């Protein structure tokens, strides 16, 4: 454990940020999983609706630095391609 006051404060702040980031990352993954579930079910309308809900969430997390912008773009591109493949 840290002995210096500023190091103790940083440890507390880091733990708080870690929990916040974990929560946001989990939320984002849940939205992505909803899109995959709709695709697996073969329901294009539900998949498109879930994608439209997921897209701003992923973009926001990329803008805030939680994930890299290229990872956000990759998620969106892959899901869009899979949705477009549905009949």
From Swiss-Prot:
Designated name of the protein: Small ribosomal subunit protein bS20
MF terms (GO), sorted A to Z: small ribosomal subunit rRNA binding; structural constituent of ribosome
GO CC annotations on file: cytosol; small ribosomal subunit
NCBIfam families: S20
Pfam annotation, one family: Ribosomal_S20p
Organism name: Klebsiella pneumoniae (strain 342)
Similarity comment: family membership: Belongs to the bacterial ribosomal protein bS20 family.
One Gene Ontology biological process: translation
Keyword rRNA-binding (UniProt): yes
Entry-linked InterPro entries: Ribosomal_bS20 (IPR002583), Ribosomal_bS20_sf (IPR036510)
């Amino acid at each position: 454990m840290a002995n210096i006051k500023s190091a103790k404060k940083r440890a507390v702040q880091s733990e708080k940020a870690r929990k916040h980031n974990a929560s946001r990352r989990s939320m984002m993954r849940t939205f992505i999983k909803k899109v995959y579930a709709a695709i697996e079910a073969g329901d294009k309308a539900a998949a498109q609706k879930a994608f439209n809900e997921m897209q701003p969430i992923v973009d926001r997390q990329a803008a805030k630095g939680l994930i890299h912008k290229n990872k956000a773009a990759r998620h969106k591109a892959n899901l869009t391609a899979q949705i477009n493949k549905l009949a």
